[in-house]
Every structure is written in C-alpha cells, then in structure tokens.
Amino acid sequence: MTDRIKVNAMDNDETKWPSWTAQGATTYAEAGVDTAEGARAVDAIKDAVHRTYRDEVRGDIGGFGGLFSINVAKNMADPILVSGTDGVGTKIQLARLAGKHDTVGIDLVAMCVNDILATGAEPLFFLDYIAIGKLKSEAVAEIVSGIADGCQMSGAALIGGEMAEHPGVMDPNEYDLSGFCVGVVDRPEMLDPAKVQEGDVLIGLASSGIHSNGYSLVRKVVTDGKTLYELRMPQESLGGQSVLDALLEPTRIYVKPVRSVLRQLPGAVRSLAHITGGGITENLNRALPENMDAELHVGTWSMPPVIPFVCRAAHLDEHEALKTFNMGLGMVLVVDPSKVDQVMDILEAEGETPTVVGRIIPGSGEVAYVDQEKLFADNPSAEE
C-alpha cells in the first residue's frame, strides 16, 4: 500500500519538483542565515586561533572535530581528565552597550579554566560556542580575539568552536557565549577537600572586580536608566575609571601562578576555591571537608572600588554582599601551614599579591567570618 501511494504521488504533476520551484524557493540567506559572512568570520579568526596552539594540537580549523594528542599525559601515573563548561551571563549586555567585545572573550575562558584549576588540573584545550542574531565578521573576530587572549593566559589551545546565527530568535546585535575546556591532572596530585586539615592557612588571590557573576543585579541597580554618556564618565569613587570600564574589567585567570605553585611545591596546596556566583560564602565551603570550617578574617584584604560601589547602589549589607560577589577575592588556596612562606614567594614571583586571609578550624563545612563588620571599613563610599 505504501509503495502504491508513492507511485501515485509521483504521477501527480502537482507534486513534482518543477511545480514547487515555480512557486518561488526560499533560500537559506533569505531566511536570515548568511553563510558567506560565516566564511568571512572564519577567515577573520584564523590568526587568533593559531596563536593559541600547543605542540599537542593536531589538525587545523575546518575539521569536524578538534584534535589533541594524549601524549601530554604520558609521564603521569594515573592521568585524570577534568572538564568544565560555563558562560559569561548578562555581562555581555554591557559589552554590547559599550561596543567592546574582546574582554568578554577573556571572561569566557577564565570562568572555565579557573573552575578546573580547582582540582589542580592543567588546562589543555578549549572550545567556544557563539550564538548571534546577525553574523558580523568584525564583531566575531573581536570576540574570538579575546577568547584567544584568555587561552594564551591559561595555556589552553583553542581547537574548535561554533558560530550559530539565530535570525528571528535573537536581535541582530544580540549574542551569547558558552565555553568548554578540558584539562588533566595526575590523580596523586589532585587537590581535594578531603586533604584539608585543622590549622591549614587560607591564602587569597585578588580579583580584578566583579568578574562574571552578579551582573543581573549590577545592571538593575547601576546601569539601567543611565545614558551611555553617564556610564562613560570617569568616576572619582572608581579611581578615575568609568562605570562601564570598571564593570567590563575581565575576570582574572589564575592558572599560571597557581600551577607554578603546584609544580614547585607538590602537596603544599590542599584544595582551592574559585569565587564565582554565590560569592565567598557559597564557594569557599566547596573546598572544605564536612568537619572543618574556613575562618575568614574580614578586613585582611582589599577590594577593587567597583565592588563597594555596586554594593552601595544595591544597599547590600555585609551578609548579603559576601554571598553575592567575590568581594575582592577571586581565588582562595588552602595551604599546608609549613609551606605558607614558600607559596607566598612563588605567587609573588608570578606577579600576584597574595594575602593570608584566614585559617581552617573544626566545624561543619561552613565559612565563619571574623570581624564581618569591617567589610566596608576601608571603603566608606559603600555605606553612603
């Protein structure tokens, strides 16, 4: 019966291809997808991609899959692959407003590689996904240039990606970013909250600003309703930066200084926390065992002025601020107390300004703040 229907349909002149095309075909380009512009975008990013390549990269742009040699792990006793994926969130809206698209590429890489660094992993390679309303090769090239910068900072090779044009779903100037990275760590050298002991020392690494979390709140209380002129005016309370520049400061990438410590002093770092969404309160506890607390001494570190600036605008108290933003600490290391001085020396040699911010005490896997009321003590503008 099925075969008869097919034959009869083909015998009907109204169902043949010529009659369909006579009615006028709709091309992919007419539907809003410009494959020619896509090809131009690929050409525009080639140099940026190539500058991230490592010796282990196999193949080149244009293949169906990114290739990377596993020989990188040949000297490891028990190599473990570590993967991470993340995005930049609504910080992209500020990049669009400013017409500046490279820094969010750095943010994208930072969010992924800093996460896998929490296991002690060395980032190996990175892939990106760009969804955009209307493909513009110049904007894509700027975004990918930032991604390549982030890859170079972290040592990850950019071995693949996707540019997806979404006409009718996204506005022409709208875009979103996602990233995916893979790293490797030798199992005996993995960082693990289970290794944390009473008396271990907390060393904080400074953030550059808000990083890439909390921007829905930031936009609501700081930028919504403001003109572009206002947002580009230098602000004394931001050290002379404009609001836009301060908010678009890219997320710091901690891979090279932390990996330097891990290579030179195996076992000195027990675990570490990447301070992202949820602030210090909801991230530092992820680096703890269930029977230990992190005693954090508030006021022992400084914070970029944009953080109290935003907290003031949102009328956040200390408790809420600490569970929303990084408050000046982008990463916290849990360190063997006998190795603190050596760890500090290595970090300083790598250009960091590490600070001892607390210690590990018996508890229940929580963050315990000492002198919480001092959070904004050196930043009176936050309390205005």
What does each model-identified segment do?
Residues A44-S208:
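Glycine-rich phosphate/pyrophosphate-binding loop regions near the starts of catalytic domains
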